[in-house]
Amino acid sequence: MTSHLLTGVRPYGEDPTDILITDGTITAIGPDAAAKAPADVQRHDLDGLIALPGLVDIHTHLREPGGESAETIYSGTRAAAVGGYT
């Protein structure tokens, strides 16, 4: 089991709080997240950073005219996901 405790993060830009993530799933948000963390939790100080849910680009152009051979749908969507958009 892998756990990460994000401390001082600002969900949606609100007041700073802690977020506990266990095996890739958010398991606790708030001041009690640290108390629920296992002893071997990996701590990450995110003071001043904002946490947002996954972002979705609903308007995208893949394989622009004249550049069809430079990109495939697979490579274009993979590049978007690596860049933080799903």
Which residues are covered by each model-predicted region?
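N-terminal metal-binding scaffold of metallo-dependent hydrolase/deaminase domains
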Residues: M1-P38
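Hydrophobic/aromatic beta-strand patches that form the interior of the parallel beta-sheet core
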Residues: L6, Q42-H44, V56
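Generic preference for well-ordered secondary structure
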Residues: R10, A39-D40, D57-T60
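Short, exposed beta-strand "edge-strand" segments with a Pro/Gly-rich flavor and a Y/T-containing core
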Residues: G13-D15, D40-Q42, G66-E71
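Short, conserved beta-strand segments within well-ordered enzyme catalytic domains
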Residues: L20, A28, D45, D57, ...
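Active-site metal-binding motif and surrounding structural segment of the metallo-beta-lactamase
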Residues: A35-A51
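Metal-associated gating/positioning segment near the N- to mid-region
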Residues: L49-T86
